[in-house]
Amino acid sequence: MPSPAPIEKHPFEPFLPEGARILFLGSFPPQPFRWCMPFYYPNWINDFWRIMGIIHFADKDHFCIPAEKRFDEALIRAFCTAEGLAFYDTACEVRRLHGNASDAFLEVVKATDVPALLSRIPQCDTLVTTGQKATEVIAATFGCPVPPVGEYIDLAMPARGTVMSSGSSVGPSASTISPSACTVMPGPDRASLHFWRMPSTSRAYPLALEKKAEAYRKLFTPSTNCAQKPIISSMLQSSG
């Protein structure tokens, strides 16, 4: 029987600054009444932007306007553009089975075509998931193992001009996802892609803010992000 919950479409456009090197993918934004700004990680009690403040400015409140309990969207957009940080989510249509923001009760109706997203930022070499649901969707899309929290695996990517298709079901809490349209990867050959699984920035995730920042700091440490790891061939099927 179909779920009675309404289908929600993603409220934001992908944020893909020119020259982006890191793509952050969450699951899906919370309901609008939880936002303090119309941008990614908009919930005032989500710590993503505090983590970025700690890592880059040694100040958890760098992107915060505490008196107004909101984040500084203009400052965040400028920072992400300068640093080459891209954002979207692994689902573009969902149902909230319990009417809340919990990943555990989020039914993925339509997954994001991640290869198509990557084709728009050809210099991106690092993909980061920020929660369990997002990690499951990416592992299913690329047919790869799930990395441990705070670690990454390298995915061998098809060469320039390869035609790819993606899509699969993502476990018992997700509906079957129809394969996406085939996508051509333009630009320079993307030999491999670092796939990082990071701890959730939600306060519900049982890890101290400082420990989360320690994990996320690895993304911005060249010796860590460029270390040699076994390369796992992507199972995206070529149709050309």
Where in the sequence are the language-model features?
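Short, surface-exposed acidic-centric catalytic microdomains
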Residues: F33-L106
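Short, well-ordered beta-to-alpha junction loops that form the rim of enzyme active sites
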Residues: S27-F28, T129-A134, S200
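Catalytic nucleophile-elbow at a beta strand-turn-alpha helix junction centered on a G-D-S/GDSL motif
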Residues: I22-F33
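Short, conserved, surface-exposed binding loops centered on an aromatic residue
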Residues: F15, R77-C80, S119-R120
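Structural motif
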Residues: R21-I22, T126
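Internal catalytic-core helix/loop-beta-alpha segment
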Residues: A82-T141
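C-terminal capping/extension of enzyme domains
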Residues: M1-P14, E18, P30, P42-W44, ...
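Short hydrophobic-aromatic micro-motifs
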Residues: L23-L25, L85-D89, W196
